[in-house]
């Protein structure tokens, strides 16, 4: 009984067209930012290093390097503040979490590109 109710609430809070991307992909995340009474879209570009959760609580982590410093940001997949997620490049990975990229610098951060068939 409770699981059925929880599933209904979970499905009601999910986006119908959730973005499709994998771990290791380089993505542009377009998020809505409110500044006072104005709304604008901010783009965060980086590599998806992990996904966690399920259903409406699913999150993904994007990492990029800014001025020599690593910056990570977590986004909810089904958030209404996420306008869209564009996949720029698909990377080949053999891990579910790419936390080892935190220790790498420069060209070592790059991943091999996945061939598209």
Swiss-Prot record:
A biological-process GO annotation: translation
Pfam families in the record: Ribosomal_L19 (PF01245)
GO molecular function: structural constituent of ribosome
Keyword Ribosomal protein: yes
Keyword check for Hydrolase: no
SUPFAM superfamilies: Translation proteins SH3-like domain (SSF50104)
PANTHER family (UniProt xref): LARGE RIBOSOMAL SUBUNIT PROTEIN BL19M (PTHR15680:SF9), RIBOSOMAL PROTEIN L19 (PTHR15680)
Summary of the function given for this chain in its UniProt record: This protein is located at the 30S-50S ribosomal subunit interface and may play a role in the structure and function of the aminoacyl-tRNA binding site.
Protein name: Large ribosomal subunit protein bL19
Lineage: Bacteria, Pseudomonadati, Planctomycetota, Planctomycetia, Pirellulales
Gene name as annotated: rplS
């Amino acid at each position: 009984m409770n699981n059925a109710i929880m599933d209904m609430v979970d499905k009601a809070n999910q986006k119908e067209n959730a973005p499709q991307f994998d771990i290791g992909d380089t993505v542009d995340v377009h998020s809505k930012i409110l500044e006072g009474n104005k709304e604008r879209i901010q783009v965060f570009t980086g590599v998806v290093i992990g996904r966690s959760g399920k259903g409406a609580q699913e999150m993904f982590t994007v990492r990029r390097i800014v001025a020599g410093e690593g910056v990570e940001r977590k986004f909810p997949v089904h958030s209404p503040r996420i306008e869209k997620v564009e996949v720029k490049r698909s990377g080949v990975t053999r891990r579910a979490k790419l936390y080892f990229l935190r220790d790498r610098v420069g060209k070592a951060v790059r991943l091999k590109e996945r061939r598209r068939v």
